[in-house]
Amino acid sequence: MEQVRVILANIERMKYEPEEVLGEILPYYAEKYTRYKREEDARQELVCGILLRKYLGVWKTGQVGYGKDGKPFLLERQWKYNLSHSGVWVVLGISDAEIGVDIERIRRYHSATARKLFTEEEQVMLEQVESEEARNALFTRLWTEWEAVLKLEGSGFAGGWRENGVDKARYAIWTKEMDGYFLSAATRDATLICLVEDEQRRKC
């Protein structure tokens, strides 16, 4: 059974100033923080770097490599990881096998997007939901489940997943609804998920 931790961090609960940690996180995220003008976007990138340093000890460029589809991996450690962010939340998934995570603020149902991205069975499920609120929630849940699976495989919705025969049913998917968001984690085998909310009371 795979070992999996999913760490949640709220960007609005940072207990220190960004300048305290910019020199202690992966330069990739420090540079994105300084480049982004929108505060929410900048803080998301900063917290990504903080979580990598805090939970995996990753803060130097030479510690990370990239697959052919751009998915990052650790060069000198057995652990696999994946990051996602939306709104006030940043998520870090850590596992001893490949993992994909996705978090999304609940979004409006869009029929054309559903037809393009979801299976026929999923489209029928969406069409049968009567209330707009419930349909939006289901649409977002399905989106995060698919995104987690595709991120596990190192691609995304634009990565030719239909042509590659990706079948969501072959994966173990864990999903949680939380205050206007959906969070999903995908692995190849059934696993127990340890969900941790990072309190951000100390630096990296």
Give the role of each language-model region.
Residues 1-204:
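Core catalytic alpha/beta fold that binds nucleotide/phospho-ligands
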